[in-house]
């Protein structure tokens, strides 16, 4: 299980390949992708989380091929914290997290328990009634991380994990 990428190609403009026949196998564990700016790291991550469709090649997450008919199943297995993410500025921290729980199809008692756990674990319990616009960049990043973890994914993908 894990992630398997086979012969992945991604072209944004005709003839310009951002990913050129990438092959990669990632077993469960902690890994990092290193590369220069423009190397295609974010593009690869967006393909893994179903935000982009590659020009060619295949991707498997936990043995399931990433294709439109499997997107809903795959999205439940993946938590994603993008490089640039947005929080609704007028929602409180708790409201933003509850929204994710609802949209993930979780039972209310389950997402409330998870929210309480992660707010405590990240040191944000005292800030849960603050509007997102009142948070520092690092606090916003932690809220984004909680959103990515809330539904207990088996795979967590974090773009630019050391920022914020």
Feature annotation, model-predicted:
Residues 131-135:
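Conserved ABC ATPase signature
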